[in-house]
Amino acid sequence: MLTLEKIYKASEVLKEVAGKTDILPASKIFCDNHIFLKTENIQSTGSFKVRGAYFKISELTEEEKKRGVIACSAGNHAQGVALAATKHGVKSLICLPEGAPISKIQATKGYGADVCLVKGVYDDAYQKALELKEQYGYTFVHPFDDEDVIAGQGTVALEILEDMPKVDAI
């Protein structure tokens, strides 16, 4: 079960790779509430996804790290896993659908991952990643349905609560 303690642990681990981002008012959104935006787009990979990937890989055993990791993505998670794996000295293979933006594919390769382009859509890339995981013994880094990934991504909420303790909703 995910605990607040684990999210705090992730926050400490992530100081190595994810900077604390600003919260800015969304002045162009007109509604009855005050809306703020967290500028996760300025993270090294352009999104918050590096947080979950980095913490997940940091929690792997040495044996799991030796075997490498695999993930599927349409872009942002791919870059997060690629960078996180490279920083940990872990081999990574990312399955992306052929239609993924070329900029995402190039960035993923640039962060050190091997890329497997899969004919079809995201679901096809997901299935291919699961097949390769079984075939080669990689650890699968799920983009959202994983306790360690959620803990890493949950550090965004800690930062929001630190900067805006009276926030009504996140």
Residue ranges of model-derived segments:
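PLP-dependent amino-acid enzyme catalytic core
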Residues: M1-I170
